[in-house]
Amino acid sequence: MNDFPWLTIIVGLPIFAGTLIFFFPHRGNKIIRWYTICICILELLITAYVFCYHFQLDDPLIQLEQDYKWIHFFDFHWRLGIDGLSVGPILLTGFITTLATLAAWPVTRDSRLFHFLMLAMYSGQIGLFSSRDLLLFFIMWEFELIPVYLLLSMWGGKKRLYSATKFILYTAGGSIFLLMGVLGMGLYGSNEPTLNFETSANQPYPVALEILFYFGFLIGYAVKLPIIPLHTWLPDTHGEAHYSTCMLLAGILLKMGAYGLVRINMELLPHAHSIFSPWLIIVGAIQIIYAASTSLGQRNLKKRIAYSSVSHMGFIIIGICSITDTGLNGAILQMISHGFIGAALFFLAGTSYDRIRLVYLDEMGGIAIPMPKIFTMFSSFSMASLALPGMSGFAAELVVFFGLITSQKYLLMPKILITFVTAIGMILTPIYSLSMLRQMFYGYKQFKFKSLNSSFFDSGPRELFVSICIFLPVIGIGIYPDFVLSLSVDKVEAILSNYFYR
């Protein structure tokens, strides 16, 4: 291939460029914002260039591989590489982070630190999606927590310290199990630790040990993904965080759990995955209904959207555990699709909060007249969230359903039952989405507007630009899902060739 260290540059550029922010003058908010956005755009362009010119779509193996010895006595390598599974999340990360820095334009307090943390998050996420070493994977997983914690506890709402502490306790607690799984897999069967993904994939484990490893990894991912009952940090965190942080949380952070589930649990522990799958499918189906019905009872707008993302994650779990290539492709499509839709909904909730300073739905009403643009975009993304045909959510959920129904692993009756339960969840989704729209935008005005100038009150060009930038891929993927599916389809076949009952 080519020996140029593209991936190291892509992972390292944001955080190294971010450290330069601290040398900027203290008062130069505008310079800092423009600098951060330029770094994000440059990073996105480099990623797109590497993807277009140095990446073969039809090759299911690892590409652009880099392997540098890092710590000698522990056989710890800086080992990066991408394949069809990680390209989608990496491009999504670049896209959403660039738009989130643009969304964070109103942040003026400690703006140097804020923008540095955004860039540090960017590095951690791309490092996680492209790491090929178990310990490096874990380090990137942990590195992600520090910027999120600081962004939450410094730029959040009234109860920000409570929600930030809850977030760090949950995720750090899950990471302990993750670390035990990583070290157990690395140290098994030899005196030297083998942390390489390739050697771990070819390593046969006893089934009992494999189940133990699987369970450790699963708890770590169940906090991040979130899988019920480990999801309670998510509504609190989303309810308090600044909306640009919410975009990164909903758009990328939740996808890290799903990515880890496929990358480590499915690829490296196939026997245990086939044992755990039926139970996880049941949990996923319960999660879809539970989160959708809980969302209906939320007064807080952001918490309602947060529960809707928990509900959508249920489809990812079902797709991953159906163990068919259709289902797994559908899960990856749902990851990308929800990354766009969730980020957009939180962004629009935040911009409307900036305008009216209300967060409870029963205090709002009649906002559609003074804010027609925000109303239009909010309605469009709510429709995408409830899987309207022609939008990406519909394509993803349809492919997941097909994957579940065509699965060889399950008997017909359980498949019909699970499909029925998830269909009820899909009926509940429009109920909470449309009631949210009705409470916010329709009805009578219940509050006094701060400014009489109506043109200032509606969405400005910046907000409109961010919304349209997210809306175009949602429509594009909905009309032609092969944009995303063509990335992962060969890799998915390679993963599923390990499963013995196909």
Swiss-Prot record:
The chain crosses the membrane at residues 4-24, 37-57, 87-107, 113-130, 134-154, 167-187, 208-228, 242-262, 272-292, 305-325, 330-350, 374-396, 416-436, 464-484. Its main location: plastid. It catalyses: a plastoquinone + NADH + (n+1) H(+)(in) = a plastoquinol + NAD(+) + n H(+)(out); a plastoquinone + NADPH + (n+1) H(+)(in) = a plastoquinol + NADP(+) + n H(+)(out). It is a multi-pass membrane protein. GO terms for molecular function: NADH dehydrogenase (ubiquinone) activity; ubiquinone binding. Its EC number is 7.1.1.-. It is an enzyme of class 7 (translocase). The keyword Membrane applies. GO terms for biological process: ATP synthesis coupled electron transport; electron transport coupled proton transport. InterPro entries: NADH_Q_OxRdtase_chain4, NADH_Q_OxRdtase_chainM/4, NADH_UbQ_OxRdtase, ND/Mrp_TM. GO terms for cellular component: chloroplast thylakoid membrane. It is found in: Plastid, Chloroplast thylakoid membrane. Belongs to the complex I subunit 4 family. This is NAD(P)H-quinone oxidoreductase chain 4, chloroplastic. The lineage of its organism: Eukaryota, Viridiplantae, Streptophyta, Embryophyta, Tracheophyta.
